[in-house]
C-alpha cells in the first residue's frame, strides 16, 4: 500500500508508516506521476484535489489535514467512490490565538483596551465559537453573525451582518468559502460593506482570501479610509497583491492556523480516519508526539490585566514576527510558499504552564486556554 503525504505535514511519515509505504511529496505543484501507483493521498490546502488530478488513478482515499475543504471537490470524490476525510477544528485554537495576538498588538500600538471594544464575529463554528468564549471570558462584548446557524434555529443570539457593521469596532471573518448559493461568502466583505465600517474599525480575515474583496479593500485604503486591517489570507494566493500588503497593518502568509499542535491535530485526524477506512482503526494521543516547548513554566504575581496578558501571549506567539517575515519577501516568486513550508515552530498557549498566586488570575488564564495553576504565595 502506497500513501502519498504532503511533505509539510508534521508526523505524517511517522504515523502513516504504520499502515503502509509512505512517500512525502510537495503539495504545490504535486508530482502527478507519483499518483499512478498510490492508494491514498494526504494533502493540505495548497493542493487542488478534483477530477482533473485523480481521474483514472488508483487513489481510494483522500485526506486533507485542514479544517477547510474548498480546495477539494468532495462531490466528485463521492461520485468516484473515493473515501474522504478532512480535519475539522484542527487549527481552530491556533487561529483564535492569532486573532488575539493581532488585537493585543494593535491595542498596544494604538492605545486602546480590548475590553472597551465590541468584536463582531462572522462565522461561529469551530474558530468563531472558541473566539467568542475567550473574548467573553475577558469581559469583551461580542456580536455574532452566522446565517446558516440562525436559520437552523441553533442556540445563540445571532445578528445580521448589517448590525455588526453598524455596532462592532472589530469585525473578524471565520467562514467557509462559498462562491454561490443562499449562504454565499465570496466577497462577503465587498466595497459597500467596507465603506460602511465604523471609523477606526479593525477588519480581520483569517479564513479564506476571497471572503474579502481585496481589490475593493485596496481602493478604500488608498482613498484614505480610517481602517486597520489584519490579513492572513489573500486574493489570490500565493501571488498576493503587494500594494495591498503595503497598506495593511498585519500581513501574514496564511499561517494563522500553523501551530505545531494544530498541524499535528490535522495529521492525526486524517490518520485516524484513514486507518478506520482500511479496517485497521488506530487512535493517537497528541501529547505523545509533541516536543517540550521552548518556554515551559512561568510565575505570575498578582491579578491578570490586559497588559500582563499581552506579555504572556507574546511570550508564546507575537504576530509581528510573521508580519516582518512576509514583508521582507513580498513580491518575490515562490517566497510565500517557502515561508509556509519552512515555518518557524509556534506553540499554543496551552504549552505554557503559569503558576499564579492569585486564584482569579489562574481561573481566567485557564478559561483563555493557558495551563495555569493557583499556588498561593507563602
Swiss-Prot record:
The molecular function GO annotations come to: 4-phosphoerythronate dehydrogenase activity; NAD binding; protein dimerization activity
Q: Which domain of life is it from?
A: Bacteria
- GO CC annotations on file: cytosol
Pathway membership, UniProt: Cofactor biosynthesis; pyridoxine 5'-phosphate biosynthesis; pyridoxine 5'-phosphate from D-erythrose 4-phosphate: step 2/5
Where, by residue number, does substrate bind?
45, 66, 258
Q: Provide one Gene Ontology biological process annotation.
A: 'de novo' pyridoxal 5'-phosphate biosynthetic process
Q: What EC number is given for this enzyme?
A: 1.1.1.290
Spell out the subcellular localization from the entry: Cytoplasm
This protein's record includes keyword Phosphoprotein: no
For this UniProt record, the keywords arranged alphabetically read as follows: Cytoplasm, NAD, Oxidoreductase, Pyridoxine biosynthesis
| Active-site feature positions | 208, 237, 254
Coarsely, its chief localization is cytoplasm
Q: Where does NAD(+) bind?
A: 146, 175, 232, 257
Q: Which reaction does it catalyse?
A: 4-phospho-D-erythronate + NAD(+) = (R)-3-hydroxy-2-oxo-4-phosphooxybutanoate + NADH + H(+)
The protein's assembly and partners? Homodimer.
**Which family does the entry's similarity section mention?**
Belongs to the D-isomer specific 2-hydroxyacid dehydrogenase family. PdxB subfamily.
Q: What does this protein do?
A: Catalyzes the oxidation of erythronate-4-phosphate to 3-hydroxy-2-oxo-4-phosphonooxybutanoate.
Q: Which NCBIfam families match?
A: PRK00257.1 (NF001309), PRK15438.1 (NF011966)
Spell out the HAMAP family in the cross-references.
PdxB (MF_01825)
Q: What is this protein called?
A: Erythronate-4-phosphate dehydrogenase
Please tell me the species this chain comes from: Enterobacter sp. (strain 638)
Organism classification, top ranks? Bacteria, Pseudomonadati, Pseudomonadota, Gammaproteobacteria, Enterobacterales
- Gene symbol? pdxB
Amino acid at each position: 500500500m502506497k500513501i502519498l503525504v504532503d511533505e509539510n505535514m508534521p508526523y505524517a511519515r511517522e504515523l502513516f508508516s504504520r499502515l503502509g509505504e509512505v512517500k512525502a511529496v510537495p503539495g504545490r505543484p504535486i508530482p502527478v506521476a507519483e499518483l499512478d501507483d498510490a492508494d491514498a493521498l494526504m494533502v493540505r490546502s495548497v493542493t487542488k484535489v478534483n477530477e482533473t488530478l485523480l481521474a483514472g488513478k488508483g487513489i481510494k482515499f483522500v485526506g486533507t489535514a485542514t479544517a477547510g475543504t474548498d480546495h477539494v471537490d468532495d462531490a466528485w470524490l463521492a461520485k468516484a467512490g473515493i473515501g474522504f476525510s478532512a480535519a475539522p477544528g484542527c487549527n481552530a485554537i491556533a487561529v483564535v490565538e492569532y486573532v488575539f495576538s493581532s488585537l493585543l498588538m494593535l491595542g498596544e500600538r494604538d492605545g486602546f483596551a480590548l475590553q472597551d471594544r465590541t468584536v463582531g464575529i462572522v462565522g461561529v463554528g469551530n474558530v468563531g465559537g472558541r473566539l467568542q468564549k475567550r473574548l467573553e471570558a475577558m469581559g469583551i462584548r461580542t456580536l455574532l453573525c452566522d446565517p446558516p446557524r440562525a436559520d437552523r434555529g441553533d442556540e445563540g443570539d445571532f445578528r445580521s451582518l448589517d448590525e455588526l457593521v453598524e455596532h462592532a469596532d472589530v469585525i473578524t471573518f471565520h467562514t467557509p468559502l462559498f462562491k454561490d448559493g443562499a449562504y454565499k461568502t465570496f466577497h462577503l466583505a465587498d466595497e459597500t460593506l467596507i465603506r460602511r465600517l465604523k471609523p477606526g474599525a479593525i477588519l480581520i480575515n483569517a479564513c479564506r482570501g476571497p471572503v474579502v474583496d481585496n481589490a475593493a479593500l485596496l481602493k478604500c485604503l488608498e482613498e484614505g479610509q480610517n481602517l486597520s486591517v489584519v490579513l492572513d489570507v489573500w486574493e489570490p494566493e500565493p501571488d498576493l497583491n503587494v500594494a495591498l500588503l503595503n497598506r495593511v497593518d498585519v500581513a501574514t502568509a496564511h499561517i494563522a492556523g500553523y501551530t505545531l499542535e494544530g498541524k499535528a491535530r490535522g495529521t492525526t485526524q486524517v490518520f485516524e480516519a484513514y486507518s478506520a477506512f482500511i479496517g485497521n482503526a488506530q487512535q493517537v494521543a497528541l501529547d505523545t508526539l509533541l516536543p517540550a516547548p521552548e518556554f515551559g513554566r512561568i510565575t505570575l504575581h498578582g491579578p491578570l490585566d490586559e497588559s500582563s496578558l499581552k506579555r504572556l501571549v507574546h511570550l508564546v506567539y507575537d504576530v509581528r514576527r510573521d508580519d516582518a517575515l512576509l514583508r521582507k519577501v513580498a513580491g518575490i516568486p515562490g517566497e510565500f510558499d517557502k515561508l509556509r513550508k519552512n515555518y518557524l515552530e509556534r506553540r499554543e498557549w496551552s504549552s505554557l504552564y503559569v503558576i499564579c498566586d492569585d486564584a482569579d488570575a489562574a481561573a481566567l488564564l485557564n478559561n483563555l486556554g493557558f495551563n495555569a495553576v493557583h499556588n498561593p504565595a507563602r
